[in-house]
């Protein structure tokens, strides 16, 4: 039963990450269609960038602690990318450059979204597999 709880916790963390990334994409889309100004958009996105990175790091460590090596290895490139951005001070969006980098920022977040969705599908698969395996015992 502990294995099932591991996958449920992982599922909830991934849903939270998915929500944070979709929130960032919505803020960028609102800026693109001129519903909000650049300052508000940048402050909304910058507010959730660090929690996203911390949550992703926690998820990777969680997979390592629970012994799910494949899932931990799957999370390492995303974690490295977030760490790389943070160490070079490029993790936040600059208000003055947001219009110039709008397409690039959207592409980055769409890639992150696809990555999280892939990880989410694998987590759902392992959740179902673990549940059925516990049911047979």
Curated annotation (Swiss-Prot):
It comes from the Eukaryota. The chain crosses the membrane at residues 8-28, 54-74, 113-133. Signal peptide: none annotated. Its main location: membrane. It is found in: Membrane. Belongs to the cornichon family. This is Protein cornichon homolog 3. It comes from Arabidopsis thaliana (Mouse-ear cress).
């Amino acid at each position: 039963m502990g294995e099932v709880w591991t996958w449920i916790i992982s599922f909830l963390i991934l849903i939270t990450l998915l929500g944070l990334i979709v929130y960032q994409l919505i803020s960028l889309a609102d800026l693109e269609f001129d519903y909000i100004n650049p300052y508000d958009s940048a402050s909304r996105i910058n507010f959730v960038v660090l929690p996203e990175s911390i949550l992703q790091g926690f998820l990777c460590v969680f997979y390592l602690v629970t012994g799910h090596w494949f899932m931990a290895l799957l999370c390492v490139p995303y974690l490295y990318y977030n760490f790389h951005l943070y160490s070079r001070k490029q993790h936040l969006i600059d208000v003055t450059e947001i219009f110039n980098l709008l397409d690039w920022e959207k592409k980055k977040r769409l890639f992150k979204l696809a990555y999280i969705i892939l990880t989410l599908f694998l987590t759902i698969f392992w959740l179902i597999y673990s549940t059925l395996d516990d049911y047979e015992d």
